[in-house]
Amino acid sequence: MKEIFAERFKSARLMKGFSLQDLANAIDGKLSRQALHRYEKAEVLPDGDTIVLLSKALDVNPDFFFRSTKVELGEIEHRKLSKMPQKTASIIKEKTREYLSRYLELEEILGLVDRFINPLEKFGIVTSYEQVNEAANELRKAWNMGNNAIFNVVELLEDKNIKVVELYVEEDFDGLQTYVNGNIPVIAYNARKANKLDRIRFTLLHELAHLLLIFGDITPKQKETLCYQFAGAVLLPEKTLKAELGEHRNKLSIKELGNIKKQYGISMQAIVMRARDCGIINEHYTKKFFFLINQMNWKVNEPTDYYGVETSNRFEQLLFRALIEGQISMSKAASLNNQTLADFRKEYQLAF
């Protein structure tokens, strides 16, 4: 019991971004840094009143400290995480771990064993654009997507047994991917960018490329470029883009690009890069377009917005299935939903 508490206590502290001294200060010195250190080292188990005190300071429910669901994050390959302050990186990892511990515990309660199958497992080594373009087509075929627009990328990934974690963290973070417990694929993304859903969609599929593809002997920069190209190809297949723009073009209009963005949920800049990759426009015009983008200050805020839906209700559906079927109590449901019982009852009172 002490070991479980110690592990969860440290996770809650890191998730909050606190050092041991920060936590001691947050509880007005009611416990010293040394006393907190003993809890974290599993030397002592605090009493009930102390657990309540710590849970309030760390913004978790008291039973958070005693969840035993195993969540081991695999290697995290992320282009920005390694450059972040250690405190920020720890917050991201622990928030990811915390959400997954609740999700996986809920699946365990319901007896769900949904194994992930990588549709590109036998695709082979990837080193070129032509290969990622082909891989994107293979993925669409395996997942029965046709060549149409993807309505909801988050829901698509969850339906394919990839856990998607919504985080609210610093703006500089886009997303990450890893495997949990060795075989459960996970993609986390920054929901603070929710006002730019096209960027979230692109990030999710960029991270999906890292999950699904095996890359050859190429530089990290080349690998990132191929992941970007894969994301673009999944969102906007070559056949679809050529149907929209034609086989070859000398120029593109902002209106055309805006209409494609609104329909397919991909940024105008990514559409232009995709058009270049597909041979619709040449390199000279691509550079000319991006010069215009910079001149008009459209790099961050494009003149046309994409209004879509990027969410999944799978966790909520499982939660209420377990509750209605009597497999969990109301208080357990509140805990799994990371809420107090009072807040849970208030929010979902019309559901019963």
Residue positions per predicted region:
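Active-site hotspot residues in diverse enzymes, especially metal/ion-binding acidic/histidine motifs
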Residues: 1-352
